[in-house]
């Protein structure tokens, strides 16, 4: 008998999204049916990681750009919310459970990444506490449902990386991004505004607070679309926008920059933007969500 597989449970099912597979399937189908597919297929997507009642509809716009028939490996880069981490970490699990079906971690890619010496191993507890990767698993399972036995996942928890570390990880992962059979999912939520987030930037010239937040987010989104890691870093230094996923975005932008050096032509476009609520007063708070896709020409 072989040892039992190490499984990461769907720890946020039943709270951040429904634990019922049939209900979840119907919700995801509903949101995806409302989204348009643009010029695809996406090599990478940016999509939010909040509870599905808040961001399920927004995320669908990114997942609609995925071509499951060519995708064999799904890299998921999410920020660490609970543990201090200065590097990137790999999961100790072999299987990630979802209410739809189980997803298998690509142990060969994991072994190759581990060999670089650039990664830590997170504990199963840390993995199950974290939601930034898990919130992409049901959508990944749904997008890939007709090819469920033909793909694996590569979850990577991204720490609070320095600019030079973002560049190193971007360089390392660029060879995987160059492969059309790989899909990268980058997991940020955008502005966290309000006193509870200790961030209350307000540009009165934009009108209501929520308009100012949208203007700030869309400025950042426009810079991400330029695919220039240095401009994005400068934007964050100037406005301190509370994008919890800035480091996964930084890694993607650096991977893209590496491929551009080799003459690979790409463009990124955002397809949807949403806010959890519209802030009008100083006592209000909101989180913003954005969905977009990277297309390689």
From Swiss-Prot:
It comes from the Eukaryota. Signal peptide: none annotated. Interacts with ERBB2. Belongs to the MEMO1 family. May control cell migration by relaying extracellular chemotactic signals to the microtubule cytoskeleton. Mediator of ERBB2 signaling. This is Protein MEMO1.
